[in-house]
Amino acid sequence: MSSMVTPQHADELSTGARQLGVELSPTQHQLLLGYLALLIKWNKAYNLTAVRDPDEMVSRHLLDSLSVMSFIENGCWLDVGSGGGMPGIPLAILFPESQVTCLDSNGKKTRFLTQVKLELKLENLQVIHSRVEAFTPEQPFNGIISRAFSSMENFTSWTRHLGDRDTRWLAMKGVHPSDELLALPADFHLDSEHALAVPGCQGQRHLLILRRTA
């Protein structure tokens, strides 16, 4: 374990995952801690996240990402505006049978994500440096997820070409975005919404699942 990652971080991750109903294998636990160590190290130079305190990263990044894993199914997933890799990296770790693509337009962030892929040997992870509007996949994704990426109107409009009627769009939000839902494009509808409780995190968390109607 990296000296930057403490036994307290390891315990917080284990306890928080159990509270979320997420069963981590020993390998997954170690991979998540390895990711945390890389995030702490690279954040100093690359400004990957506004969260500077490593003691806050377990709850605000790892556990926040794990809070949506019960809504994920195996398949091909896209994390849009992945930034420092949340929730795409945890998704790739917990679903090794899935193909996960992390996309970001910031070159520093995609270089970091590529380093994570290499160091953690995440063979099911693809990193793409591109604007989302310019990205064209070989086939539609089964799921498209974003965390603090943009408004839901932009999220759906910019990624419409990346999915089809079978695709689920998952938007991770803080306060319930009632106004944003009113501005959804006409060909999208709200499939379900879920209030999330993230161990160690104050404030509201919501997951909104969307589908295309056409």
Swiss-Prot record:
CDD domains: AdoMet_MTases. Specifically methylates the N7 position of guanine in position 527 of 16S rRNA. The gene is rsmG. Its EC number is 2.1.1.170. It comes from Pseudomonas fluorescens (strain ATCC BAA-477 / NRRL B-23932 / Pf-5). GO terms for cellular component: cytosol. InterPro entries: rRNA_ssu_MeTfrase_G, SAM-dependent_MTases_sf. GO terms for molecular function: rRNA (guanine-N7-)-methyltransferase activity. It is found in: Cytoplasm. This is Ribosomal RNA small subunit methyltransferase G. S-adenosyl-L-methionine binds at residues 81, 86, 132-133, 147. Keywords: Cytoplasm, Methyltransferase, rRNA processing, S-adenosyl-L-methionine, Transferase. It catalyses: guanosine(527) in 16S rRNA + S-adenosyl-L-methionine = N(7)-methylguanosine(527) in 16S rRNA + S-adenosyl-L-homocysteine. Belongs to the methyltransferase superfamily. RNA methyltransferase RsmG family. It is an enzyme of class 2 (transferase).
